[in-house]
């Protein structure tokens, strides 16, 4: 419900941003009962280190609209209406296929992704300005 929305103040390199979070009490993890708001507040708290580790890279967003026990999907393209602080870079694959890919450069963009029901962020091993030149080795260890 729209009346249930909250607005979080998220510090960042361009100053504070206000990020609206709808359905803040939606339970994302049934055990131990973590809500969408708690996940967003966590990302506000760890915003600096999160951006240091994942920022300035194309990222795929793994979204769970009904929590982790519900259906999930991956989102790469920034949706229409994304705020101006959510960046994108045009990526091209060896096949020649190309599309815009989300790039998170500040904590407010990560909190916005939670608003879009993102639970897992999958950053590329390369930076947005050189998508064909990985500068990290990343190993994805899934618990299930």
PLM features per residue range, with description:
Residues 2-135:
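Active-site loop/lid in soluble adenylation, ligation, and acyl-transfer enzymes
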């Amino acid at each position: 419900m729209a009346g249930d929305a909250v607005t979080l103040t998220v510090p960042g390199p361009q100053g504070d941003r206000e990020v609206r979070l709808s359905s803040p009490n939606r339970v994302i993890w049934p055990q131990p009962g973590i809500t969408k708001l708690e996940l967003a507040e966590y990302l506000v708290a760890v915003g600096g280190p999160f951006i240091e580790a994942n920022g300035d890279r194309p990222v795929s967003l793994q979204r769970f609209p009904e929590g982790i026990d519900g259906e999930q999907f991956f989102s790469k393209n920034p949706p229409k209406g994304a705020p101006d602080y959510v960046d994108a870079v045009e990526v091209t694959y060896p096949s020649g296929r190309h599309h815009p890919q989300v790039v998170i450069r500040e904590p407010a963009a990560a909190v916005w992704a939670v608003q879009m029901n993102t639970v897992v962020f999958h950053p590329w091993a390369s930076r947005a300005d050189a998508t064909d030149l990985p500068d990290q080795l990343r190993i994805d260890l899934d618990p299930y």
